[in-house]
Amino acid sequence: MMIDNISNFDKVRAVVVAILLYIFIILVVDGSISSLIGKYITYPSDEYHIIEFYDFIHIIGFLLSLSISTYFSSKDIIKDFAKFFTIFFGITFILGITLFLGLTFFENHIPSMRGYTTLMLFFFLLNLFKKLDKITN
């Protein structure tokens, strides 16, 4: 197995880096977004939509931090997987925040991010299975 070639120290380091990156992403993004959109929470549905946005940040932030730490601490085919998913989740993260802020400032209330998050997770699984299919063939 590919994972057996990695030392235990590298595995622990990858987990620690992923946790630290995740905490950094959550603290920075949650804090900055909360300070920017405080005055736009006017409708009753906005409270629920802000929770959906935080769910988006937590899910995509976790997957992004996991793929970044895997990329920096692995070799060979696992590194190729991690590079692809780092780019994928990085673009997803930036587009999601841009979409959220743009719609918030344009519409003057908080948009729902549930559909975007579901769509991105669907594309993630689709790309994952395509990559796995290429490896097995």
UniProtKB/Swiss-Prot annotation:
Membrane topology: Multi-pass membrane protein
Keywords: Cell membrane, Membrane, Transmembrane, Transmembrane helix
Predominant location category: membrane
Transmembrane recorded as keyword: yes
Localization terms from the record: Cell membrane
GO cellular component assignments: plasma membrane
Entry's transmembrane regions: 14-34, 48-68, 84-104, 109-129
Protein name: Uncharacterized protein MJ0796.1
Organism (species): Methanocaldococcus jannaschii (strain ATCC 43067 / DSM 2661 / JAL-1 / JCM 10045 / NBRC 100440)
Higher taxonomy: Archaea, Methanobacteriati, Methanobacteriota, Methanomada group, Methanococci
